[in-house]
Amino acid sequence: MLILISPAKTLDYQSPLTTTRYTLPELLDNSQQLIHEARKLTPPQISTLMRISDKLAGINAARFHDWQPDFTPANARQAILAFKGDVYTGLQAETFSEDDFDFAQQHLRMLSGLYGVLRPLDLMQPYRLEMGIRLENARGKDLYQFWGDIITNKLNEALAAQGDNVVINLASDEYFKSVKPKKLNAEIIKPVFLDEKNGKFKIISFYAKKARGLMSRFIIENRLTKPEQLTGFNSEGYFFDEASSSNGELVFKRYEQR
């Protein structure tokens, strides 16, 4: 199984590293082209394009400027340890063993606006470039046109290398839109997480994001290799609801804490 997750806006380059092993991103030639485009933007343009504050725009203009084609542990850190959003709160990669990192390196991929596809141990320099941003480039009007089939092809390589044709889609819609399902040599399974609120079950963004991380961790810790094993997921009160599920969608629910 190949797990797909989204990146995070919040980054951590300060915490102690729990592994010294690293690999290099495989699509850096493409990343360099995007950096070339991003460096043309002024901080006010970045603020408008990304809908962020002037302060954040200044930080990200500096990140684009400081980005270097040579990645080392001095200027970058492993992607799975650098991202720190809700998904990664659930994933808790900082507590992984070396064997966990090994399994994740083969079975987990992070989709990225700048790097395309990241393996957990791929070094990553800090950036902010969400997949949905309309950054004009030599290949089109946005990042979806820029990446084209590249992300899908890279995922097909990963699928072939890890031995089956199942993708567990735990990425957001914004990021999974960069994948072309018809060209992906895989059966796609999407876990959905519903939380009870006032007697009704619905997707609550914060909880759903964290649950995607919890599910990723569940697969990695237990070395799961078959989709039917996912139904045993019960972290933090979630349970599988077979009646609400379909072939391509596994529904997990959690009752409101009273």
Swiss-Prot record:
GO CC list: cytosol
Record-linked InterPro entries: YaaA (IPR005583)
Protein name: UPF0246 protein YaaA
NCBIfam families, sorted: PRK02101.1-1, PRK02101.1-3
GO BP terms in the entry: response to hydroperoxide
Pfam families registered for this protein in UniProt: H2O2_YaaD
UniProt record similarity statement: Belongs to the UPF0246 family.
Domain of life of the organism encoding this protein: Bacteria
